[in-house]
A protein has these predicted regions:
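The feature captures the short pre-catalytic strand/loop hairpin that immediately precedes
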Residues: 81-90
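Bulky hydrophobic/aromatic packing residues
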Residues: 10, 100-104, 162, 171
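Short, contiguous acidic/charged loop-to-helix segments that flank catalytic cores in large enzymes
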Residues: 27, 90-99, 112-118, 154-159
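Catalytic cores of carbohydrate-active enzymes
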Residues: 1-82, 125, 132-164
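Well-ordered alpha-helical scaffold segments within catalytic/enzyme domains
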Residues: 38-49, 105-117, 166-171
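Extended amphipathic alpha-helical segments enriched in small hydrophobics
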Residues: 1-4, 98-134
Length: 171
């Protein structure tokens, strides 16, 4: 369709194999972020199967951790892996690498859309990674965000509804 063609022309780079994070008339931001997984998770996606597969595999390799998806790839000079410091410093790091568990639901939906039954082993692994966190840290819940580097310490709100709800959706 013309919408899919326009979207692909605007956001896709065949060589990079992923979507631009932001586009305007003058430039494109090629920071590798999880925002593109939403396009793969839609029932009527603007991405074709090969685009979605490339986005998901790249996201798995560059963003997926045992606690969620990083908000920015480590190979980006803007990457900040720890949520520490004063309020201004922490606020700045929030979208620069910090891990958000709630993004896992959309990642999982995209993975199922493309890989169908072959997605199940990865999704079970993702879910099972949280067993001790659910039992010990949040007593039935999980944190809002996590550091992007081992040991992936929980930060922010100790029991975040959108984080646990997306994990339940995976289950």
């Amino acid at each position: 369709s013309s919408l899919k063609t326009a979207f692909k022309d605007m956001f896709w780079d065949e060589k990079k194999g992923y979507l631009a994070d932001f586009c305007d008339d003058q430039s494109k931001d090629w920071s590798f972020r999880p925002n593109q997984i939403f396009a793969t998770a839609l029932k009527y996606s603007v991405c074709d199967k090969e685009m979605s597969k490339s986005i998901l595999e790249s996201s798995k390799n560059k963003l997926l951790t045992s606690r969620g998806l990083k908000t920015l790839s480590e190979d980006d000079e803007k990457f900040i892996g720890s949520y520490i410091g004063d309020q201004k410093t922490r606020d700045h790091s929030y979208h620069q690498g910090i891990v958000w568990p709630w993004l896992l639901g959309h990642f999982a939906q995209g993975y199922v859309n493309i890989f169908r039954d072959n997605a199940l082993p990865l999704l079970e692994e993702i879910y099972n990674e949280f067993n001790s966190e659910i039992a010990d840290y949040g007593v039935g819940s999980i944190g809002e965000i996590y550091d992007a580097e081992p040991p992936f310490a929980a930060k922010g709100t100790i029991a975040q509804a959108w984080s646990i709800s997306e994990l339940i959706r995976i289950k």
